[in-house]
Amino acid sequence: MDPRSEVLLRQRHLFAAPTLLAGLPADDLLAELPLAHGWSWHAGEQAQLDARFPGRSRFDTRAPVGAWSAAVVFLPKSRELADYLLASLAARLPGGELFLVGEKRGGIERASKQLAAYGRPRKLDSARHCQLWQVQVEQAPAEPDLLALAQRYSLPLADGELQVVSLPGVFSHGRLDRGSALLLEHLDDLPKGHLLDFGCGAGVLGALVKRRYPASRLTLLDVDAFAVASSRLTLAANGLDGEVIAADGIDGAPRGLAAIVSNPPFHQGVHTDYQASERLLQRAAEHLAAGGELRLVANSFLKYPPLIERHLGPCRTLAEGDGFRVYTARRP
């Protein structure tokens, strides 16, 4: 059981009425709270919840409609996303109770101040290195417009400006990260055909690839609903076509790909987690056509080349700078 869920269950009497759990983990919490429903934006966790609790959790960027007496936000890493979640739920709960739960190392003490916009926050519990806060919604806001919260910026590239649209919670929100900046400079001579942007975030890599190789088919994949929505907005802002899918890792990707480009993720909430990246390297060959290429950027300290060579083929370093390296390998 996730420690945040354990803290909630210490106060389970507060959640005996219909309660919405925003960002809930894929554990036994829904079994323990029979009137609760989930709101998830993580495709992998949603799949697990669907398998165990059919119809009791929704995958979306917007809060599900329901007659909730209370709502709980599991504190995300992004402050902007936390603001959006709290405002979305406070708008649905005039006079109701809004809870915030999170790990101390994830910043719950600081984040609890975000509740003050809706009433007087109270700390209800502290256990398992987590805290539970509550506020009665005295000042219900208007429901936030997610698109109005998007950050838009332009990248001046050699073949023209690229427009990027980033929603709260997306990696490197509102700016280009250093790893992607390096990879953007080394996307020449990709094989033509079906191309995949794995862990697409706001869709920067995929949009450039589609513009540079317009005859190629493009798929973008991310585990996060806000990233999927951002990538669709980025493609639309540049007048580009592409399929954007939500999936938990490379196992959800198409097969027969000509190339995979990626700045692979290595965070899950506040925790470092290389599982999705390592699985990409281990399984890329299963999704690439013969002669297909994997081209990715990663922190220089990560020992990816031996893993790539073990599972795909000879690995070359195309570029290095600012603490990152661009690697390439082809399926035989």
From Swiss-Prot:
Main subcellular location of this protein, as a coarse class: cytoplasm
**Protein's cellular compartments:** Cytoplasm
**Gene Ontology MF: a single term:** nucleic acid binding
Q: Does the keyword Cytoplasm apply?
A: yes
InterPro entries to which the protein is assigned, alphabetical = DNA_methylase_N6_adenine_CS, Mtase_sm_N, rRNA_ssu_MeTfrase_C, RsmC/RlmG, SAM-dependent_MTases_sf, Small_mtfrase_dom
- By its UniProt entry, which Gene3D superfamilies does this protein fall under? Vaccinia Virus protein VP39
Instruction: Give the source's domain of life in one word.
Output: Bacteria
Q: What does the record give as EC number?
A: 2.1.1.172
Per the record, GO CC terms? cytoplasm
Catalytic activity from the UniProt record: guanosine(1207) in 16S rRNA + S-adenosyl-L-methionine = N(2)-methylguanosine(1207) in 16S rRNA + S-adenosyl-L-homocysteine + H(+)
Alphabetical UniProt keywords:
Cytoplasm, Methyltransferase, rRNA processing, S-adenosyl-L-methionine, Transferase
Any Pfam family matching the protein: MTS_N
Entry's family note: Belongs to the methyltransferase superfamily. RsmC family.
Quaternary form? Monomer.
What is this protein's function? Specifically methylates the guanine in position 1207 of 16S rRNA in the 30S particle.
Q: Specify the protein name.
A: Ribosomal RNA small subunit methyltransferase C
The record lists the organism as: Pseudomonas paraeruginosa (strain DSM 24068 / PA7)
Q: What is the lineage of its organism?
A: Bacteria, Pseudomonadati, Pseudomonadota, Gammaproteobacteria, Pseudomonadales
Gene that specifies this protein? rsmC
